[in-house]
């Protein structure tokens, strides 16, 4: 994604990020909107997936209130539509870089009758009865380069409030939901959001896929940078993740008995390797990590992002995370990554819009020395 713009979403009245790099770090004081930016990026990248609402709800512990979409709107003001847009760059063709924009407008719709059951695009339980008093739904209008008219569909809670359903408005909308974007956003139309809480269930699935494809060696190399005893990763049929720490241990050690740093590091690198060609969004990148592990983390991220062609957009509250990134880039062996990195300072203005200030590698050290705005 080359740029991202959002209006009236979560804590963001307005924000724009431009010239996004392969690896991006968002910094700023508390309540500057960093997590909301990640959620907005997640929405636009997963707009045809009916579960994006549940996914971002879970990051805020809002899943108990399953019939209220108002928390998605800035200031809970549903009279103004949410606007999200992402600009994507394609492969260079004849010295030109094709650019296209995917835009989405979300508004609240008060409905009292369901659309015909045959129009339901996705639902977990097809025999769920009609609900004569359906809750509010979200009307989503998409503008994409491959069609000349907007595409529209509704997101609505199911009868039992357990999952989301998508209702296409017409055949073009149905085709888009089934096939996805055909233009250059397609390769990046996949995003994974990592919150501050480790999800060992998802991690188990990712590790299983990597082991099947014999791609776990890079994970082990990164983990051994923190603990040289780690020999291999094992998965149990029950979903437990184990680490083999060598002959000094009689049994395999469950991952959840290791420190938070090992879990966090494994979750991040595994997410990158499992989402090749997509976007990985990481909230509080350094959460659970001792500052001494930050160099290991950055080296692993920079290498994996290039290896798997993944765009990284992460947040931090720590100036240490930014300092260690600059120190890693200062090393001559990592000079090739310098053009792949950007940091953005987010500052909430008096009118409550959030302004972003971009720093490339050459500007990072100066920005740190002159008090780039982070919590500490």
Residue ranges and their predicted role:
Residues 47-273, 341-376:
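Phosphate-coordinating catalytic segments in nucleotide- and nucleic-acid-processing enzymes
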């Amino acid at each position: 994604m080359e740029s991202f713009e959002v209006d009236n979403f979560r804590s963001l009245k307005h924000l724009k990020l431009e010239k996004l790099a392969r690896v991006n770090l968002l910094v700023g004081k508390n309540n500057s909107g960093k997590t909301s930016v990640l959620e907005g990026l997640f929405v636009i990248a997963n707009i045809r997936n009916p579960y994006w609402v549940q996914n971002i709800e879970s990051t805020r512990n809002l899943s108990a209130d399953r019939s209220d979409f108002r928390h998605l709107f800035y200031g809970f003001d549903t009279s103004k539509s949410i606007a999200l847009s992402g600009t994507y760059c394609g492969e260079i063709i004849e010295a030109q870089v094709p650019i296209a924009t995917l835009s989405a407008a979300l508004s609240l719709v008060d409905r009292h009758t369901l659309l015909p059951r045959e129009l339901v695009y996705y639902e977990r339980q097809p025999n769920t009865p009609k609900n004569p008093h359906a809750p509010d739904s979200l009307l989503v209008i998409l503008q994409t380069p491959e069609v000349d008219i907007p595409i529209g569909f509704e997101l609505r809670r199911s009868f039992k409030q357990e999952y989301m359903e998508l209702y296409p408005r017409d055949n073009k909308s149905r085709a888009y939901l089934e096939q996805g974007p055909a233009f250059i956003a397609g390769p990046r139309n996949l995003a994974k959001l990592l919150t501050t809480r480790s999800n060992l269930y998802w991690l188990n699935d990712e590790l299983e896929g990597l082991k099947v494809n014999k791609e776990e060696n890079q994970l082990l190399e990164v983990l051994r940078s923190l603990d040289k005893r780690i020999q291999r990763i094992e998965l149990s049929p029950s979903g437990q993740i184990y680490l083999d720490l060598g002959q000094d241990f009689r049994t395999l050690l469950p991952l959840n008995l290791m420190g938070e740093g090992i879990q966090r590091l494994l979750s991040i690198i595994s997410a990158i390797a499992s989402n090749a060609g997509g976007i990985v969004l990481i909230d509080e990148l350094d959460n659970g990590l001792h500052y001494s592990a930050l160099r290991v983390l950055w080296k692993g991220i920079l290498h994996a992002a290039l290896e798997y062609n993944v765009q990284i957009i992460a947040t931090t509250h720590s100036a240490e995370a930014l300092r260690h990134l600059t120190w890693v880039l200062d090393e001559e062996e990592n000079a090739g990554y310098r053009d792949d990195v950007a940091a953005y300072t987010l500052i909430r203005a008096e009118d409550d819009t959030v302004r972003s200030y971009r720093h490339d590698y050459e500007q990072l050290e100066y920005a740190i020395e002159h008090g780039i705005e982070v919590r500490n």
